[in-house]
């Protein structure tokens, strides 16, 4: 993956800088589960270049966002060691956000400098990334002061895993060369052979994403959704519109054949709403009121 054409601001919350080491420590996770070929292939490529630990869900946890699941002090969460030809790997009975939190708190050794999530089978573009376990894992990493890299691959038959792995390894090296505050990058790779990829572009988040979701029906005890991700007439339907409408978005650029990079932020304060200094927000009956100070 070539260096991006232009710089884009990376806005991050206050956190300590990640200290560079001679051999950076990297955590690899995903939301497709420990058996995903994208996870295994990326682990094999990263192993040897970094102090790598793999910790991934025991089953598919797609759509888990930044969730960590439900747990309490009286019960432990199952963690099993896997044998991966010299690669340290664990299965976690929970979503990827939980694996990242555990790593940040020392479950697998020192906190990683970088958390890589992927390679996801299917793109993660647009504002719908908030629901993605792949992206949620790296947003969780950022809240703990680590760099985060989410890598997703567009569908093709056969899957072009090599293209995604090649892009991921270059992006990981690029991020770890960053000496500022931790950053989060969301990378989407087109389902093309490496030789056919047009290049790398910084991209804006699309309004929706590659998938179009609609409410098909609902009754008293059932919600039925309709999900579509098939290109139509050479364009991708995105929330009822064409991806080509805004060519600078991650959905459109990836569909056109580019590897896309989008900088994301973790949760941070948004600042006080713009209200008059004497504005009062009414609280529930019997309570107090909130007044600007």
Regions of interest found by a model, annotated:
Residues 9-29, 36-106, 110-111:
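A cross-family phosphate/adenosyl-ligand binding-site feature
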Residues 29, 55-57, 117-120, 150-152, ...:
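Short beta-strand segments
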Residues 32, 60, 95-96, 120-123, ...:
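Short glycine-rich anion-binding loops that position phosphate/pyrophosphate groups of nucleotides
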Residues 103-109, 136-147:
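Alpha-helix C-terminal capping segments
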Residues 114:
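Short, Asp-centered acidic motifs that coordinate Mg2+ and/or phosphate
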Residues 123-132:
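Glycine/threonine-rich flexible loop motifs
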Residues 142-164:
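Glycine-rich phosphate/pyrophosphate-binding loops
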Residues 163-293:
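Electrostatically charged, flexible surface regions
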